[in-house]
Amino acid sequence: MSRVVVIGATGHIGTYLVPRLVDGGHEVIAVSRGTRGPYHASPQWDAVTRVTADREAEDAAGRFGDRIAALRPEAVIDLICFTPASARQLTEALRPSRPLLVHCGTIWVHGPALRVPVTEDEPRTAYGEYGTGKAEIEALLNQETRAGGVPAVVLHPGHISGPGWPVITPAGNLDAAAWTQLATGRPLTLPDHGLGVLHHVHADDVAQAFELALSRPAAIGGSFHVVAEQAMTLRGLAAGVARWFGREPVLDFVGWDEFTRRAGPGDAEVTREHTFRSITASIARAREVLGYAPRYSSLDALREALAWLVADGQADIGDQPFPGR
């Protein structure tokens, strides 16, 4: 058993991770802004110590790292660190006590793939604020570990999916109309022949990897992809979803200009951000070192997500029967 501080404890990953840690016998301190509970209630949360903190404000005031260190953690799981300055403040505060630090990165530390599957050893070619920030944090934490400071592990999830929030659809964005079109047999517009690649992962599989990292000393100083066993193309995801409803997908392949006109600039840009990378991430290292074994395929994760979205009124599948509806 260890004393584990989870930062961002009530988010997508923490909702699944905190109960896992409690079941594993850990003493858990859950840090969040306190504005809402986890996405799904479970009795394990009754055994958790809750701490309310606004990281952005406390980072700006220079207090957040010291606040976490004062909790006397043996391990810190940081699910919401997005800037090198934030990571630096935390590691400097933790350096005297040197707890294990497990950081949530992203497969977007990789830019457009040159070889597939992409391994953790590929040179970092991130672009955009989110990906480059995470790549810089990864480099900072690796250097921290090599220098004998805070021992760190970095986990890189794909597109985190599951019940409780909107997820990236087979159109590569968050527009729920894609679910309606696939369920009811209406045409779904896709760019580039639908060959853009997405690599989803169920939030509970991400939680599994974080839990495993706490007990794998060989993981220290390493980075690991945490995704479903296989990535899928947009057209493959569309076919899988349509078949839940006994259909073959009706797909309308167009160029980017026409896709942008139909989808709108905002949704088209989200699709472009995902498909221009088209990352297929290898999990061989996570399997070998962490013992990571994802339970959910990409379609499994989307199926659970869609069942929840339909039940919550956020997705319309018409009169189609759907398991879990």
Report the location of each language-model feature:
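N-terminal Rossmann NAD(P)H-binding glycine-rich loop of SDR-like oxidoreductase domains
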Residues: V4-G24
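NAD(P)-cofactor binding segment of oxidoreductase domains
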Residues: A69-V116, T132-N142
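Conserved beta-loop-beta element that borders a ligand/cofactor-binding pocket
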Residues: A139-V167
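Substrate-positioning beta->alpha
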Residues: P170-A178, L190-L214, G221-G222
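Active-site "gating" loop of Rossmann-like NAD(P)-dependent oxidoreductase/epimerase domains
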Residues: T106-E129, T145-G148, W165
